[in-house]
A protein has these predicted regions:
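Positively charged n-region of N-terminal signal peptides that target proteins for export
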Residues: 1-6
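Bacterial N-terminal signal peptides
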Residues: 8-17
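Non-catalytic cap/lid and distal C-terminal segments of serine-dependent acyl enzymes
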Residues: 25-338
Length: 338
C-alpha cells in the first residue's frame, strides 16, 4: 500500500504568518521604565507553540452509542513473571457482549494496556470494539490489556502509590524495545494461558490474533509478530519507536529497533499485516528520528510486498492521531475475519 500523508491547512498558521508581517512594537527605553516594573515586563510574549495534534478529533465510532451492547472490562494484577522474574504488572480483559463461550473469540493484545481502556482519553478501545462488533465491521474479539512490568517497592507490595501510579523500577524499555523474542514468549507462555485459565476460548489461528501499541509499545507489537507470525498476523503500531533505544548484541552485531528495515529487507516476507501511523513532528533525540525511522519501515514493507498502510500526519509524540485512526485501522486489519 502506498503511504498516506495528511496535510491539513491550518487557519492558525495563516494568522501566525500575518502576525509576523506586522511592524513590531517599539521597545521601551530603560530610562523611562518604572522602577517597580520588572526588567522583562515590556518584552513581547513568545508566540504560543502550535498544537499539531489539535486537528485530530475522535469520530462517531469512538463515542458510546445508544442500543449498542456493551462489553465488560475486568482488571487484574499479576504479582510476578517467569519470563521477567521480580516484575509484576496490572492487566485487564475486555470481553464483548456477543461472546457466548461457545465459539473461540479473536484476540487483540495492547501494550501499555491500561491507557487503552475506559470511555475517555485518546483510545477508548472498549467503546470502539463495542461499536464495530455490533455493526459487523470486526469479529467478536477479546482484548487483553497489559502494562509493562515493575518491581514494587517493599513498602508498597501492590506496586501502587496513593495517586494510583506504579511505584518501583519499570521494566518497560527492556520488555518493549529489545529486539528479541522474550516478550512474545511472555505473551504465549504466561498471559494468554492466564486468560484461558479463566474460561475464555481464544483462537490459535494467527489471522484471528492482533497486537498493538504506541511508541515503544508500537515497536513491541511489530517485534512480537516478527518473531512469531504463527501467533500474531495483525499489527497496529502508532508513533512506533523504531529507533536504537536498546541495542542487543547478537552474533557480534548490535541489533536495535533501527535495524528493523534492514531485517525486513533481508528476510523472507512474513505473513503479517500492518497498520502504522506517525507524525512529522514526532521525536528527534539521541536514539534517532522517529518520522524517518517509521518512513524507513514503511519503505521496507513496500519493497517486500507486505500488506500494510502507513499514515504520516503532522502530529507529535502523542496518541490523538492514532486514537482518531483506531476505528478505521481495526476495520482494515480485520477485514478478512468475521
Amino acid at each position: 500500500m502506498k503511504s498516506l500523508r495528511f496535510i491539513v491547512p491550518c487557519l492558525l498558521a495563516g494568522l501566525s504568518t500575518f502576525a509576523l508581517a506586522q511592524t513590531p512594537a517599539a521597545k521601551a527605553d530603560a530610562s523611562q521604565r518604572n522602577a517597580n516594573t520588572p526588567a522583562d515586563a515590556t518584552k513581547t510574549p513568545a508566540p504560543k507553540e502550535k498544537d499539531w495534534n489539535a486537528q485530530y478529533v475522535l469520530g462517531p465510532d469512538s463515542q458510546e452509542k445508544a442500543n449498542v451492547p456493551k462489553g465488560v472490562v475486568t482488571k487484574f494484577h499479576l504479582d510476578d513473571s517467569k519470563t521477567f522474574p521480580g516484575y509484576g504488572r496490572d492487566w485487564a480483559l475486555y470481553v464483548p457482549a456477543q461472546y457466548d463461550g461457545k465459539k473461540e473469540a479473536c484476540l487483540m493484545v495492547f501494550q501499555d494496556g491500561m491507557g487503552y481502556i475506559g470511555p475517555k482519553g485518546n483510545w477508548r478501545v472498549s467503546t470502539v470494539f463495542d461499536n464495530l462488533i455490533a455493526e459487523g465491521k470486526m469479529p467478536v474479539t477479546i482484548a487483553l490489556f497489559i502494562n509493562p512490568g515493575f518491581a514494587p517497592d517493599k513498602n508498597n507490595p501492590t506496586g501502587k502509590g496513593k495517586d494510583g501510579k506504579p511505584l518501583g523500577k519499570s521494566n518497560r524499555s527492556f520488555e518493549y524495545d529489545s529486539v528479541t523474542d522474550a516478550y512474545v514468549k511472555f505473551l504465549l507462555e504466561e498471559m494468554i494461558p492466564l486468560v484461558e485459565s479463566k474460561g475464555y476460548k481464544i483462537s490459535k489461528d494467527p489471522k484471528r490474533r492482533a497486537i498493538g501499541g504506541a511508541s515503544s509499545g508500537g515497536i513491541c507489537a511489530f517485534n512480537a509478530a516478527w518473531w512469531r507470525p504463527d501467533a500474531f498476523s495483525k499489527v497496529f503500531t502508532t508513533i512506533g519507536s523504531f529507533t536504537n533505544i536498546r541495542g542487543v548484541n547478537t552474533n557480534g552485531k548490535e541489533v536495535g529497533g533501527n535495524q528493523f528495515p534492514r531485517m525486513v529487507m533481508e528476510s523472507p516476507k512474513k505473513d503479517i499485516r500492518i497498520f502504522s501511523q506517525d507524525g512529522s513532528h514526532d521525536l528527534t533525540n539521541q536514539f534517532g528520528v522517529w518520522p524517518e525511522a517509521n518512513q524507513k519501515m514503511a519503505d521496507a514493507w513496500k519493497a517486500k510486498g507486505y500488506d500494510y498502510q502507513f499514515v504520516m500526519g503532522e502530529g507529535t509524540h502523542d496518541g490523538r492521531h492514532g486514537g482518531m485512526l483506531l476505528p478505521e485501522a481495526m476495520k482494515w486489519l480485520w477485514r478478512d475475519v468475521r
